[in-house]
């Protein structure tokens, strides 16, 4: 499977390393604004320079590159794994529209553990809510992360919103001078140090608290998930796939 990697930051380098180690993948090039002379693959500054056709693009870059990636993918019928966070509503709509022509996987978190957490939430969130439990999401990341709350925190909220319906996300309680409403789900972000990523869902009821927590101990969990998504797209002609629909 010919892979074109978009983005060569910390995550991109880890993805490239794993791709080189696996026989089922052929890393044909890397698109990055910063060239790395030590990289054994061809380095490109943009997609227009790429001559070989890729079977799949794995994107760990920036939302600003979306239009170029979709244009290349639609032209070459290339599948895309979007593992980038921070897409706007308009950009997500573009991804959905493009998926009518090509196969796309999009997730803010590609780890298997988060996939399991979302499955658990689909089973228990509504029951907790219906029995009067308050729901809060807390996420922690390193001090270099730009977006807040994290895409994964938004994903966890969306999973519960689908099950419960009628919920309202609350990102900042400092401006609210009223009691907590039942339909609210708080989403809070902490930034500091070198935390890879930690997400906690709290169900607070009368005299008891239940917590579901996922902690990433290295970025490798996201790499493995992205490669698994690329393999899963092999037999897909078109469509928009997520952790819920692909596995």
Regions found by a protein language model. Name each.
Residues 98-99, 103-142:
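Hydrophobic, well-structured mid-protein blocks that either form specific transmembrane helices
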Residues 49-68, 78-81:
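Rossmann-like NAD(P)-binding element
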Residues 61-62, 85, 191:
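Short glycine-/small-residue-rich Rossmann-like dinucleotide-binding loops
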Residues 71, 84-104:
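Rossmann-fold NAD(P)-binding glycine/threonine-rich loop
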Residues 19, 73, 96-99, 128:
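A generic structural signal for well-ordered alpha-helical segments
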Residues 10-48, 132-247:
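C-terminal substrate-binding/catalytic lobe of Rossmann-fold NAD(P)-dependent oxidoreductases
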Residues 76-79, 101-102:
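A short helix->loop->beta-strand "cap" motif at the edges of active sites that frequently abuts
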Residues 4-7:
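Conserved N-terminal Rossmann-fold NAD(P)-binding element of oxidoreductases
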């Amino acid at each position: 499977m010919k892979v074109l990697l978009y983005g060569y930051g910390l995550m991109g380098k880890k993805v490239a390393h794993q791709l080189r180690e696996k026989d089922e993948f052929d890393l044909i090039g890397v698109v990055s604004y910063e060239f790395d002379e030590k990289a054994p693959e061809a380095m490109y500054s943009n997609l227009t320079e790429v001559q070989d056709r890729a079977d799949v693009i794995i994107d760990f870059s920036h939302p600003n590159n979306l239009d170029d990636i979709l244009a290349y993918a639609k032209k070459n019928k290339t599948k895309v794994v979007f593992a980038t966070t921070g897409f706007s509503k308009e950009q997500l709509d573009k991804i959905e529209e493009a998926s009518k022509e090509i196969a796309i996987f999009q997730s803010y978190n590609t780890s298997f553990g988060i996939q399991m957490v979302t499955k658990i939430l689909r089973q228990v969130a509504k029951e907790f809510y219906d029995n009067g439990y308050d729901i809060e999401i807390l996420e922690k990341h390193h001090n270099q992360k730009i977006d807040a709350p994290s895409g994964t925190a938004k994903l966890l909220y969306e999973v519960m919103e689908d099950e419960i319906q009628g919920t309202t996300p609350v990102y900042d309680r400092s401006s609210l001078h009223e009691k907590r409403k039942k339909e609210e789900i708080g989403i809070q972000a902490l930034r500091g140090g070198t935390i890879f990523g930690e997400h906690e869902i709290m169900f607070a009821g009368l005299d008891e608290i239940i917590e579901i927590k996922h902690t990433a101990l290295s970025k490798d969990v996201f790499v493995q998930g992205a490669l698994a998504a690329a393999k899963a797209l092999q037999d897909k002609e078109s469509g928009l796939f997520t952790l819920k629909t692909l596995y």
